[in-house]
A protein has these predicted regions:
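N-terminal acidic leader/helix
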Residues: 2-33
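N-terminal start-of-chain detector that recognizes signal peptides
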Residues: 1-5, 43-46
Length: 75
């Protein structure tokens, strides 16, 4: 599970904070390209950040409006 907070879009780039398992002590600030989904900063590239990016990508397919917060769960 990953929780995303402070989701903001600036042109072709989205930034957000990803929290592994919702743990505030396991925060990763991620900046990624909307078109390529490529991480643009030195964020940890792990299953949590990738899942967060994928979730935001799917939200954008449904609506042009991004939420300020989102979550993604998997088994």
């Amino acid at each position: 599970m990953v929780k995303m907070d402070n989701i903001e879009r600036n042109g072709n780039v989205i930034s957000m904070d990803c929290y592994e398992e919702g743990d505030l002590n396991r925060r990763h600030h991620v900046i990624f390209d909307v078109s390529t989904l490529e991480i643009k900063n030195q964020a940890v590239n792990n299953v949590y950040t990738r899942q967060g990016i994928w979730r935001i990508h799917n939200i954008m397919k449904e609506s042009p409006e991004l939420p300020k917060r989102a979550s993604s769960y998997w088994c």
